Amino acid sequence: MIDLLWISSDGHPQLFYQFINIPFAFLFHCLSSQGHLSIINRYVYLAMGGFMLAIATMGPYSSLLFLSAIKLLLLIHYIHPMHLHRWILGLQMCWQTCWHLYVQYQIYWLQEAPDSRLLLAISALMLMTQRISSLSLDFQEGTISNQSILIPFLTYSLYFPALLGGPLCSFNAFVQSVERQHTSMTSYLGNLTSKISQVIVLVWIKQLFSELLKSATFNIDSVCLDVLWIWIFSLTLRLNYYAHWKMSECVNNAAGLGVYFHKHSGQTSWDELSDGSVLVTEASSRPSVFARKWNQTTVDWLRKIVFNRTSRSPLFMTFGFSALWHGLHPGQILGFLIWAVTVQADYKLHRFSHPKLNSLWRKRLYVCVNWAFTQLTVACVVVCVELQSLASVKLLWSSCIAVFPLLSALILIIL
């Protein structure tokens, strides 16, 4: 299993590192639930775990995270809560963008491959930006009252289960999970087994698709096969994300995070920290629905940070900020522009066509056609965003699949 996870990482070792984190998260939960760790020691355990994980996986580049954590504590101590969010988000995005631009300088100007440890550190820095900007907004909204003890804030910025993979957890939910730590061991172990099994299945399916892409099936020059190849390639990239998100969810659950107790039914839910279901997301029959389901905690963060706080063109401002957060590579800029246009066109098309769907067969036909359109458009977005460089743009526009983003733009203009 470990070999399978390592092979499937394909230069993105977060999946493997997150798997290695599970025993340490399990130990934390066992010690906490049995009363061997005080609340302060729980925070220390999680923070020290993040500190050591960063050094072990990122080497000297772990300082990117440590400097951000120190800056967070200084700002919390010296800045009034009402002004904290503006300072934290502004400084953190400047710090993160500088490193993104440095990577682009290495790739496009020096023609050098960046250090993999630097790329991992920047990825972790992006996740830290989510956490500390969410924290600062909570301060501004008055949902956090006690800021005299700084250890919970330091731990929240660096705790090891979410350091390399999320999902985003609000500060108040994080504190409640750390301080509670009482769950049924049967439910706990059953949940971990189930989610690890899901990761294995996702990795296995991804490997099958990877082998299919290398097969002789696609050596024939055909428009349909060309479009099919790009769609399968995009699906393979998405499966990598789904496996990584599920593994990160599993690590958080192993540490006792993301659990919710239903008082009325007496049952325990382990899905409070989740970036969504692969089946629900891939079954989305509208681009706008897919956009809301994809990487759900990040979508909620973008809605909270940008969409709900912007009066002019909130949709395009949100996708623009997402491109900035991801690194502003040429492919990413094009990919998020395509996605924004497609989602806006979907809203217009739905308002136009919905009154005309007055029979069952029309509704089913509309759903089927729109699902295929969603899949092919998302394929264009994912290829651009993931390949990042101008090569992704060339790959996209040399294929007939480029018709679908253009069709979205046409719908947006006409309707």
Curated annotation (Swiss-Prot):
Catalyzed reaction equations: octanoyl-CoA + L-seryl-[protein] = O-octanoyl-L-seryl-[protein] + CoA; decanoyl-CoA + L-seryl-[protein] = O-decanoyl-L-seryl-[protein] + CoA; L-seryl-[protein] + acetyl-CoA = O-acetyl-L-seryl-[protein] + CoA; L-seryl-[protein] + butanoyl-CoA = O-butanoyl-L-seryl-[protein] + CoA
Record's comment on post-translational modification: Not glycosylated.
Highest taxon of the lineage: Eukaryota
Membrane-topology annotation of the record: Multi-pass membrane protein
A Gene Ontology BP annotation from the UniProt entry: peptidyl-serine octanoylation
Active site: residue positions: N295, H326
Subunit details: Monomer.
Annotated function: Catalyzes ghrelin acylation at 'Ser-3' using preferentially octanoyl-CoA, hexanoyl-CoA and decanoyl-CoA as acyl-CoA donors leading to ghrelin activity. In vitro uses also acyl-CoA donors of different lengths from short-chain (C2) to long-chain fatty acids (C16) knowing that acyl-CoA donors from butanoyl-CoA (C4) to dodecanoyl-CoA (C12) are more efficient compared to longer acyl-CoA donors, such as myristoyl-CoA (C14) and palmitoyl-CoA (C16) that are not efficient.
Name used for this protein in its record: Membrane-bound ghrelin O-acyltransferase mboat4
